[in-house]
Amino acid sequence: MKQIALLVVVLSLSVVAESLGGRLSAEELSSLPYSQSLNFDFGPGKVAPGYTQVLQTTTYSKELGYGFEPGADVTCVDRGGRDALRSDLCTSDQPFFFSVALPEGNYEVTITFGDQSAETVTTVKAELRRLMLEEVRTAAGKFTTRSFTVNVRTPQISSGGEVKLKDREKTSELWAWDEKLTLEFNNERPSISAIEIVKVTAPTLFLLGDSTVCDQPLEPYNSWGQMLTRFFRPGIAIANHAESGESLRSSLSARRLDKVLSLMKPGDYLFIQYGHNDEKEKGEGVGAYTTYKASLKHFVEEARKCGGIPVLITPVQRRTFDAQGKITNSHGDYPAAVRQVAKEENVPLIDLHAMSGVLYEAWGPEASKRSFAPNDGTHHNNYGSYELARCIIEAIKANKLGLAKYLITSTAPFDPAHPDPVDSFNVPASPQVTAVKPPGS
C-alpha cells in the first residue's frame, strides 16, 4: 500500500486536471496527500475549474481509478447556464454506484445535489451499505451540498501481516477492503452534480463485534453498526471492523483487534459488542465469567495502551418471547459478565441487551417480526437496525461520552419503549439481495 505524505495546506488539483484534459490517472488518485481534494464534475456540460469530468460512459477500472460501477444505468444531462458545476448532472430512476481508488484513511466527502429542471431525492450509502445521508431533497432549480466523513480500509497491518479475511470478505464483502471508496446513490430520483473528496485526520470510532454489528453486504440483512453513521455529522469517521460469526477469541485470532490498534490514535473510541458466538464456545474453563471476561479485559487494556477510549456493549437480544409477550434472556450469563467488566475496569457501558428487550416488547411478538430478516430471530433488517442504532445514540448521550459532540443535533430523542412506526421508515433497500443467512445466530 502506498503511503501518503502529510501536507498541512490545502492543495488544488486544477493544474493536474487541466494538464490531463480533466482526467486524473489511477496512480495520481492513489498517492494523494492529506488535505488535497479530488473534485468530480458530473455531466456533459462545461467542466468547472479544478474538477474532473464524469460522463455516463465513465466506468470504473483500476487503470482509470474512478467511475461508475459496472451495471450503472445513469443519464447525464446538461441543462445549460453559466454555473459549470450546477448546470449539468447525472441521475437515474434506480440505484447506482460510483467508486474512487483511495488509500486507507478517513475522508470528508462533500456532494452537490440538485437539478435545474426537476425535483431530486437522494439517499447516500458508502462501502457496504453504511447509511451516510438518509434523504436529501431538492426542489426544481434548487441545489444543496451535504458532507460526511467516511473510513476506507485495507487488510494490511502496519506492523506486518494482515487481517485473516473470510471467504465472504473476498467476494460479497470485498468493497470493505478493496482500496477504494464506493458510494451508493439511491431513492426516488438520485441526482448528483459534484463530489469533492479530501483526506482528513478526523478521530475514529472503531467497532468490533459480530453479525449484529458488522456491515452486512446484502439485503435484507443489516446491523446497527452500518446505520450508526447516519447520526454523526462530519468530523468523525466510523470504522466498522465487526464481522459475522465472530467471537472475542476468533476476532483476536483473525487479527481484527491488531488491525484496529495499528490505526488507533489517542482519543479514538472502540465500541466492543460480542456474545452471540462466544456463548457457543465449548471447552474446559470456557465461559462467561472466565474466558469471555478475560478477553473483554484484554480488548479494553489494549485499546487504553493506544490512548483509545473503550466502550463495552452488552449483546443485543434475540427475538425470544415467552407466553406472556416478554423477552426471555437467550444469552445466559454473558450480558452480566459485560456489566461486571465495565464496573471492574471503569469502562462506559451501553446496555443494549436491556434496551433491545424494551424495544422488542414495545413491538410485541408479532409486530417485532417486521424488524428482523425473514424467518430469523437474530439478524435485523434495515428498520430494526436503524431503531437499534437510535438506542446506541441515546446511550452515547446518557453516558456523556466525548464523541456526543459529533452527533447531529437535529435528531429527536428516542425512547425504545416508543419506537418509530415501521410505516414511516423510508430508507430504500440496496439492490444486492441474498437468501443466505449471515454466519452466527
Regions found by a protein language model. Give the residues of each.
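Bacterial N-terminal signal peptides
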Residues: A5-E18
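Compositionally biased, intrinsically disordered or flexible polar/acidic segments
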Residues: L20-E219
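N-terminal pre-domain segments of enzymes
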Residues: L24-S35, K46, T409, P413-D423, ...
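Conserved beta-strand scaffold positions in the cores of enzyme catalytic domains, especially
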Residues: N39, I238-N240, N346-L349
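Short, structured coil segments at secondary-structure junctions
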Residues: A126-E127, F232-P234, C306, E345
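Conserved SGNH/GDSL esterase-like catalytic core that processes O-acyl groups on lipids
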Residues: W177, E188-P190, V198-F206, T212-E301, ...
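Alpha-helical cap/lid subdomain in secreted, periplasmic
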Residues: R255-T409, P428-S441
